[in-house]
């Protein structure tokens, strides 16, 4: 424990807080260009074919982002909006692509949680 005199001389250093989405650089979302769109498999107890994309963000940082929802229209050179939020069973995937924004279409025939997937309300 330092003495008061030592604290007067030196002071305390603030704790360094690590962010979960460093590539976003403090922004809620960032725009980027898909460099590769592919599928991958999740870690052990789960089994599926998950759709992911390598995205080069505007700052020049390249990240792996998950494409949520059923079906997508993304390909190389598509311009996408990337938000934070990891996918627990895909190692290294710490970002998600926003559906219904820029070149990404919303999910077709989506009834519930529509705003998350950029789906319009169905006409009766």
Curated annotation (Swiss-Prot):
GO cellular component: small ribosomal subunit
UniProt-listed GO biological process terms: translation
Region (Disordered): 105-124
InterPro entries hit by this protein: NA-bd_OB-fold, Ribosomal_uS12, Ribosomal_uS12_bac
Classification via Pfam families: Ribosom_S12_S23
CDD domains membership: Ribosomal_S12
Regions of compositional bias (Basic residues) in chain numbering: 111-124
Gene3D superfamilies in UniProt: Nucleic acid-binding proteins
GO MF term list: rRNA binding; structural constituent of ribosome; tRNA binding
3-methylthioaspartic acid carried by residues: 89
Record key words, sorted: Methylation, Ribonucleoprotein, Ribosomal protein, RNA-binding, rRNA-binding, tRNA-binding
Known partners and oligomeric status: Part of the 30S ribosomal subunit. Contacts proteins S8 and S17. May interact with IF1 in the 30S initiation complex.
The family this protein is said to belong to: Belongs to the universal ribosomal protein uS12 family.
Function according to Swiss-Prot or TrEMBL: With S4 and S5 plays an important role in translational accuracy. Interacts with and stabilizes bases of the 16S rRNA that are involved in tRNA selection in the A site and with the mRNA backbone. Located at the interface of the 30S and 50S subunits, it traverses the body of the 30S subunit contacting proteins on the other side and probably holding the rRNA structure together. The combined cluster of proteins S8, S12 and S17 appears to hold together the shoulder and platform of the 30S subunit.
UniProt name for this protein: Small ribosomal subunit protein uS12
Natural source organism: Micrococcus luteus
């Amino acid at each position: 424990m330092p003495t008061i005199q030592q604290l007067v001389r030196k002071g305390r250093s603030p704790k360094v807080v690590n962010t979960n989405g460093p590539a976003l650089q403090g922004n809620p979302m960032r725009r980027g260009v898909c460099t590769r769109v592919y599928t991958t498999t999740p870690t052990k107890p789960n089994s599926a074919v998950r759709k992911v994309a390598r995205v080069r963000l505007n700052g020049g940082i390249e990240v792996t982002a998950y494409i949520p929802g059923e079906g997508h229209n993304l390909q190389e050179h598509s311009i996408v909006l990337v938000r934070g939020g990891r996918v627990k069973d895909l190692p290294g995937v710490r970002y998600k692509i926003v559906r219904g924004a820029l070149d990404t279409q919303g999910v077709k025939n989506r009834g519930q949680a529509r705003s998350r997937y950029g789906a319009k309300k169905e006409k009766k």
